[in-house]
């Protein structure tokens, strides 16, 4: 199974990176930028092709969807390369007056790459560090906690995610405009941000339609490769001349329990996870566009940013508002700071422009809040669960819910990062974004009312999502804080070890002037650091300082300590996340391994695609998504997520009377339902049931069926599990 899982990860990487890389090189972006940006372009392309295929080629095999995207992006890349080649040759033709200098001009031709990266080999080494650290953290927190690579999370939303991906595979349709948990039963469906599900379906199609395996592989790929590379690109763009900060960012891309791991243990909110992860891929081209000197380059970069934003929104619309917060704050900061400037230029004109940008953003926010198509989202309310004081304490400790552990080390790093940005105000917008997100979390988790709806309604007023927002915005601040502490500790060590310990790396052309290196946690603009101090990792003291700080990071994240608070234990770091994943992915929970094996037997006994009436709370709500069993109820609720609530009520309350109830008989005829499956005996000693939205009185029509009930023939049994054929 391990080799199969690795194969699924490789397939996911190929789908995410090959088509998107080709399109990014068409702009052309540099090789590293193209690799980092590729997932956004691939996700957008897959989703749009899925919509087109629904109208033009229905059904469409999942591998064909990925193949078509690769072919299309390859064609675009080749055409763009040919056009650029022709244009370059035309521009290089010497006239009679300057033919003697033609070779010199050719050798001096500037690069046309966008987001070009000097010392490209170094950024690839940094990227390798990001991936390596993320691999270690993900292996400890996620992969090591799985009860098999094909296990799945026993979460409520997971029933939908697995069913939607399975429905895409069963029907050969991949349109986000026609999404439902019941596509295989003929439902047309409606709009749902299903970019995640399209990707999972494509990967699963290459591995026997194993949706659970593909889901876990995709989670691993996004956390080990995709998001770390996105953060690497972002930190390079913001702090490129300070390699200490860039390298420090490797520790923090997947270090916060609130994001990304909070979305893995709660919900699961996997579409929202990848939406947030792609925000840097839209932000970096936007930042570059504001600084680009040529109008043509600005246009290309804004197009790339728009494509990235579309990918973010199509994965989960609230990601677009997440991007908007960062983009607006950076744009306001950019008004006062020219490219490369360390000090702000403040005058009446710039202040007016900044106010105008903020005012326009507020107007757009209000317009979207009042838009009719947003009302179902912004009017959703999650009731407050904490007092304001509790929220103010838990938020900065990055324990946004009971599923997450406190992370005091990260709190200190972020605080130091905030102090740093207050001194180096070019990056102050990062702290403003984080503090705004933290305020959103505090408001969403501890208050109710109009302010909560207006400010956090785009995230469903869900404190899980606003907490993740704060964690996402904290990542670059943590990197800055860590680098600042390393530089400060390095200075202390040098004083104790003597000057002989200092072996600074020689300044290179693109590193020789670094005014932003953090010589101390509170270094000021009045005393900029040197290239030698910025590259702390190239001294003996710097290496020791980095090692000490990294060891502290590891201890505070993974040490299995806990403190008592009321009637519960609060764990440190990511330990609680690991325990949550271990519990939720266990085959001893709800849908057990024995029950899953029984489902396999059921699928062998009954005709293919035969509908089975079930009680979703006994674990069978996952049986369609996990195994492909055509169940009637696919979520733990009275309707099982079906549109016809009256039909669902009749079945769950009156099915046991099928021998005499004509209405039940007619409903079964309409549904073509001939089987009933029970995975638990409600009167048994140890039923593995969900308590969510389950009341025994609502399911008496199914759970009271026995082999003595008229109209039912027992055809398969094992322990307390039963399969009946309906006969009347």
Label the predicted regions.
Residues 1-124:
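Membrane-embedded, hydrophobic transmembrane alpha-helices
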Residues 7, 56-64, 148-154, 208, ...:
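Membrane-helix boundary/interfacial segments in multi-pass membrane proteins
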Residues 11-14, 552-728:
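Extracytoplasmic
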Residues 46-48, 139-146, 171-174, 246-265, ...:
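Membrane-interface helix-loop junctions at the exits of transmembrane helices
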Residues 127, 135-277, 577-592:
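Active-site lumenal/periplasmic loops and adjacent helix-entry segments of GT-C-fold
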Residues 279-300:
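Membrane-interface transmembrane helices that cradle and orient dolichyl/undecaprenyl
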Residues 300-317:
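Membrane-interface alpha helices of multi-pass inner-membrane proteins
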Residues 408-431:
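Hydrophobic, aromatic-rich transmembrane alpha-helices
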